[in-house]
Swiss-Prot record:
Keywords: Amino-acid biosynthesis, Aminotransferase, Histidine biosynthesis, Pyridoxal phosphate, Transferase. It comes from Serratia proteamaculans (strain 568). The keyword Transferase applies. GO terms for biological process: L-histidine biosynthetic process. Homodimer. GO terms for molecular function: histidinol-phosphate transaminase activity; pyridoxal phosphate binding. CDD domains: AAT_like. This is Histidinol-phosphate aminotransferase. The modification N6-(pyridoxal phosphate)lysine is found at K211. It catalyses: L-histidinol phosphate + 2-oxoglutarate = 3-(imidazol-4-yl)-2-oxopropyl phosphate + L-glutamate.
Amino acid sequence: MSIENLARTNVRDLTPYQSARRLGGNGDVWLNANEYPIAPEFQLTAQTFNRYPECQPALVIERYAEYAGVKKEQVLVSRGADEGIELLIRAFCEPGKDAILFCPPTYGMYAVSAETFGVERRTVAAKQDWQLDLPAIADSLDNVKLIYVCSPNNPTGNLIDANDLRSLLEMAKGKAIVAVDEAYIEFCPQASVAGWLNDYPHLAILRTLSKAFALAGLRCGFTLGNEDLIALLLKVIAPYPLSTPVADIAAQALSTEGIRIMRQRVTEIAANRSWLLQALQNCACVEQVFTSDSNYLLARFTASSNVFKTLWDQGIILRDQNKQPGLSGCLRITIGTREECQRVVDALSALPGATKTRQEPM
């Protein structure tokens, strides 16, 4: 008998999330995972590796609460924001009965996490401008316990309209948790909904140190919510989600100096993003570049498969978005160093058709 026959049916049928590392590649310019291109330096200060860590490391919680402008009781730390996505499903959704709802094109882990736990995945496609289709969502809320909204949205890069988010929260009152994924909020901090927590007890906010804090390898994320919501998540989280070294480095990253350095990175990435956006608009193989409030750009190409493979063969690894609804011909490009951005532009400019006659980026 195959061991697979012992597995749960939904797990046998599951297609795992195709992360950048799972997809692989042999490049030296990695622009496919929205990581910061340069590794930060930290020194471990904690040496108590013989002891179990705190369930919720006090210094990490304290510093993140201060940074986010919320109370300590409104913060939960986890192994990346991905664990936060799962914790919400485990805490609020009955398998085989309840559903989650999300609006593609968007981050793929919402669907994978729900499928893993036997929870229905319900989708309402975003409108042509990638904003929420509120009437369609209102018609789809039967048995929905969780609504995931990514803002800025991955992979499109746009912010979700704040008035629409408020309308969604009003619509979901007494029915569902609204989880706003703010993994990229450091690139547009004015758009955070963290200040809304006291108004909406059914609001959860997902955060991470993987992007602007340049700590994707650390696997440290946060869920913000009111005390009752956090208390429920604490019931289902593993007893020691963060190892001692992870908590040590996270606390350093959230120090006054760590936050200053993070904001310096954001300024640098924003400048490179503006440069790359203009440069891509000069490339004949590019049909459209979409504006972004994050650390990546989405672009539609005339022959995206050829572009993807040509750059792949040169060691420049991008993220193919062709399978996402409404994103035919689209590739997502992480904003790297200026030199990495130049490598992308040089490779694209060498493709047949050369470049458009337009002003060069400064």
